[in-house]
Amino acid sequence: MVMARKSDTLSEDVLPEDVRLEASLRPRSFDEYVGQGPVVEKLKVYVQAARSRGEALDHCLFSGPPGLGKTSLAHIIANELGVGIHVTSGPALERKGDLAGLLTNLDARDVLFIDEIHRLNAAVEEYLYPAMEDFRLDITIDTGPAARAMKIDLPPFTLIGATTRTGLLTSPLRDRFQIQERLEYYDAKALESILHRSARILGIPLDKDAAREVASRSRGTPRITNRLLRRLRDFAEVEGNGRITLELAQKSLDRLGVDASGLDSMDRKILLTILDKFGGGPVGVETIAASVGEQRDTIEDVYEPFLMQEGFLQRTPRGRMATHRTYQYFKKQPPPTPQGSLF
């Protein structure tokens, strides 16, 4: 769990390099946040209204593929409200006591951020319901005939949940979030803005055409954009003059295995598995996962959304299928007859 307040700064000597850099690049206000315009504009209104009334913001649920800024929005909301933020994740809350410890340490109007909230176990999730609805904990003391119920009042707080798998949330939990927003992939222009902002913070000279090239290969995802920028900085410092030019960006991205379409080695491995081993599909995701040596959840959460968004993959009731664009990408001849009906 990470706990921070608006005036807090994380101690740099205890953070791994990537975590420290990610924290330094994270926007701290709505004005610094790039992209997701409709979502941000609504959140500004909700936050301003809650702040003017002196109330806790309604509970929020942010969904969407990984790396689009759900965690950043949670931190921004806490900063804009001027309250503390307590950060944890669904898998970390194994027992009711884990959740009770967090909730009883909240101050009035604080933000509790639960990442991967779809991975909460059922017992912990049910324990959360009265806390969300009535700001109350229902605790059972002792067991058997001596058991007795005890209610603990909690200060009003805001729960912000983040998920990449909205469909795995139970209806009772999902319905308790009064604010629900989905984050979408970023366009290239927004990613260019993020690149230039990050480059300024890190002190990296970055040419405009180089930023355009990196943005086009970033899968519409700011986290990937910033990760690529850090790797290009390494190439620029070791093999160049410290400046990221278009030529250096193109050569370095090629060496990193990120092509002009934004596909990386695992994307290509997944698609080639469908094409070469299973005749273009349909094939089940479990079979794909076993063939490429990757977890099913990772394929569904990280790789498939982008591949489907870009038209490289089709999901059908019978399994995953390659598309005509996939055959064109690999310069392969598509099958002469339909591979099967969707019905």
Swiss-Prot record:
ATP binds at residues 25-26, 67, 70-72, 133-135, 176, 186, 223. Residues 1-186 are annotated as: Large ATPase domain (RuvB-L). It catalyses: ATP + H2O = ADP + phosphate + H(+). It is found in: Cytoplasm. Its EC number is 3.6.4.-. It is an enzyme of class 3 (hydrolase). Mg(2+) binds at residue 71. Its main location: cytoplasm. GO terms for molecular function: ATP binding; ATP hydrolysis activity; four-way junction DNA binding; four-way junction helicase activity. Residues 260-343 are annotated as: Head domain (RuvB-H). DNA binds at residues 296, 315, 320. Residues 187-257 are annotated as: Small ATPAse domain (RuvB-S). Signal peptide: none annotated. Keywords: ATP-binding, Cytoplasm, DNA damage, DNA recombination, DNA repair, DNA-binding, Hydrolase, Nucleotide-binding. Belongs to the RuvB family. Homohexamer. Forms an RuvA(8)-RuvB(12)-Holliday junction (HJ) complex. HJ DNA is sandwiched between 2 RuvA tetramers; dsDNA enters through RuvA and exits via RuvB. An RuvB hexamer assembles on each DNA strand where it exits the tetramer. Each RuvB hexamer is contacted by two RuvA subunits (via domain III) on 2 adjacent RuvB subunits; this complex drives branch migration. In the full resolvosome a probable DNA-RuvA(4)-RuvB(12)-RuvC(2) complex forms which resolves the HJ. The RuvA-RuvB-RuvC complex processes Holliday junction (HJ) DNA during genetic recombination and DNA repair, while the RuvA-RuvB complex plays an important role in the rescue of blocked DNA replication forks via replication fork reversal (RFR). RuvA specifically binds to HJ cruciform DNA, conferring on it an open structure. The RuvB hexamer acts as an ATP-dependent pump, pulling dsDNA into and through the RuvAB complex. RuvB forms 2 homohexamers on either side of HJ DNA bound by 1 or 2 RuvA tetramers; 4 subunits per hexamer contact DNA at a time. Has 3 domains, the large (RuvB-L) and small ATPase (RuvB-S) domains and the C-terminal head (RuvB-H) domain. The head domain binds DNA, while the ATPase domains jointly bind ATP, ADP or are empty depending on the state of the subunit in the translocation cycle. During a single DNA translocation step the structure of each domain remains the same, but their relative positions change. This is Holliday junction branch migration complex subunit RuvB. It comes from Myxococcus xanthus (strain DK1622).
